[in-house]
Structures are given as C-alpha cells and as structure tokens.
Amino acid sequence: MIDNPGLYDDLYMDLTFVDVFEKYGLDAPVDSFANAFARAGYMLWHANQAARYNILNGIKAPLSGHWKNSPHADDIDYQIEADFPGLMSPGMPNAASQISDKIGHIMNYGDGWYGGVFMGAMYSLAFTSNKSLPAAGRFTLWFKKP
C-alpha cells in the first residue's frame, strides 16, 4: 500500500490544484493545472484519466475535457473535486465559479462541469451562514418532532 497509494484521485486532484495555486498564484494559466496532474504519478479514474490521456497526447486544456475529445465529458469527476474552489473562496461564490471555469473544463464539460460549479459555489456560500441547519428546514423540523 505504501508504494501504491490507491485510487483516490478526487483528493489528489484537489491537492495538486492547490499546489499549483501556491506555486504560480491565483492567475496560474490553465496549462499549469493540466500539466501538473497529467504528469503526476497517481492513478486516475474516468474523466480525469481521459483528460490525462488527451493532455499527454497533445490535446491541450480546455479541449482535453470537451465532449468531442472525451467520452467522459459529462461524468462527475469535477463535481466531486469542486469542493476546493469553494474552500479557497470563502463567501465568494463568483470567485469559486471562476476557478471552476478554468479548472473544471480540463476534464469535464456539460453536466460534470455544471455540477462542479454548483458544488464549488455551495461550499463557498457555506461560509456565509452561522447556522448549519435552517430552523424551518425539513430536517430540523423532523428532528424536533417528539
């Protein structure tokens, strides 16, 4: 297990993208993100793997995730990974969406990308509330029943 960390690409991708921001700043070009995970030694799954293949074979981002170049363009890979833009943009959903626009298209278009933009914005907006459960929400009302 030490030699092969397993197939946890959703975590590895987040950490790779954060590392790129740390090294190159918030205006890092899309190629720096694409090349970072394409050349990384960890295993990938579905749309991430297809994007890696495309990048390593000359199809640059963002076309690496386009449906014409990837049968996984609508997969949920970016949706799963999109927590990091929201966590890096607390209370700033537009900033999270800008990150998603740049990075999400490396591996996804269509539903996979839209889901990622939504998730990133939700994570970002979570920082604007001091209530984890709305008082009038169904779960809270159900939980309070005797």
Which positions does each model-derived feature cover?
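Structured, active/binding-site neighborhoods that engage oxygen-rich ligands
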Residues: 1-146
